[in-house]
Amino acid sequence: MPTYISLVQFTDKGIQAAKETTQRVTDWAAKVKSKGVSIKDMYWTLGHYDQVCVYEAPDDETAASVLLAADMLGNIRTRTMRAFTTSEMERILSQMP
């Protein structure tokens, strides 16, 4: 399954409810599991971003839909990247002209 990495920032609403952040992630992971999304790692961080989430989704459309739904709740803003494993990158490189 494709892997994604989201860099997460709390909104004003999200930081006001920071004590609930771990429970929100637990609840969210259970909710998106039914869409085939699996959260592999979640880190709370210092600096420009408040969290880093590593997860797998069946496809880009599913990843986008769960991110949009999360952002709509108003607690976070996300910047997301598609990540490639070594074997995926080797396949990509083998297709280069």
Language-model segment annotations:
Residues 5-9, 43-66:
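Short, well-ordered beta-strand segments in beta-rich or mixed alpha/beta enzyme
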